[in-house]
């Protein structure tokens, strides 16, 4: 009888812990297991009816919470770098660089959500979980996202993520060859190339 009582208490405790572990906290916990990584990715953009309109590929480097380098290689090259204070966006085709303060950057974009992994950002979404897949629906109708989905393994490896905008356009990113570990600090530094136009919005 005593053993049965102990067993029941253990099972009850396990069930309580399961209930307390919300999808949102589970997602944050998984992402927190990997603080820095490098991966390549593919991108597919499609219209609301599923018609593909763009495919691309690139690489990204992340060091949470505020350092990242997102390098879109094709179809058109672009670079988005955060050095922890400034967010740099470089478009080689138009030879222009835009600089803004990172703390002014919106937290309602998929990449910012993943790299910052800030509880205040996740709190703006209703989060549901199905295995290793997490669906996030904004609580505010003013959000430019309609739905955000991310697949994260228990060890923190990100398989991919997708975003559906209010007009139904869907962007799907599949991550490949994620390598966890230290990232060269140079990846998070950016100096505008000579001759490009600098739109410095930090002065506004």
From Swiss-Prot:
Keywords: Chaperone, Periplasm, Protein transport, Signal, Transport. The keyword Methyltransferase does not apply. Residues 1-21 form the signal peptide. It comes from the Bacteria. The keyword Ribonucleoprotein does not apply. CDD domains: LolA (cd16325). It holds the Pfam family LolA. GO terms for cellular component: outer membrane-bounded periplasmic space. GO terms for biological process: lipoprotein localization to outer membrane; lipoprotein transport. It is found in: Periplasm. Its main location: periplasm. HAMAP family: LolA (MF_00240). Participates in the translocation of lipoproteins from the inner membrane to the outer membrane. Only forms a complex with a lipoprotein if the residue after the N-terminal Cys is not an aspartate (The Asp acts as a targeting signal to indicate that the lipoprotein should stay in the inner membrane). Monomer. Belongs to the LolA family. This is Outer-membrane lipoprotein carrier protein. It comes from Edwardsiella ictaluri (strain 93-146). The gene is lolA.
């Amino acid at each position: 009888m005593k053993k049965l009582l102990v067993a029941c208490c253990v099972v009850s405790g396990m069930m309580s812990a399961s209930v307390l572990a919300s999808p949102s906290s589970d997602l944050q916990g998984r992402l927190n297991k990997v603080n820095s990584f490098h991966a390549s990715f593919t991108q597919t953009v499609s219209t609301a009816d599923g018609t593909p309109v763009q495919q691309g590929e690139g690489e990204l480097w992340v060091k949470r919470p505020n350092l990242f380098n997102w390098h879109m290689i094709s179809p058109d090259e672009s670079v988005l770098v955060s050095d922890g204070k400034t967010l740099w966006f470089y478009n080689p085709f138009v030879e222009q660089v835009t600089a803004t303060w990172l703390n002014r950057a919106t937290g309602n974009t998929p990449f910012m959500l993943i790299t910052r992994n800030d509880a205040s950002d996740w709190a703006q979404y209703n989060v549901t979980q199905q295995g290793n897949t997490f669906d996030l629906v904004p609580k505010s109708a003013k959000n430019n996202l309609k739905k955000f989905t991310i697949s994260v393994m228990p060890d923190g490896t990100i398989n991919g993520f997708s975003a559906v905008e209010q007009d139904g356009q869907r962007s799907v990113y599949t991550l490949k060859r994620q390598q966890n570990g230290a990232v060269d600090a140079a990846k998070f530094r950016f100096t505008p190339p000579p001759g490009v136009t600098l739109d410095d919005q930090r002065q506004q």
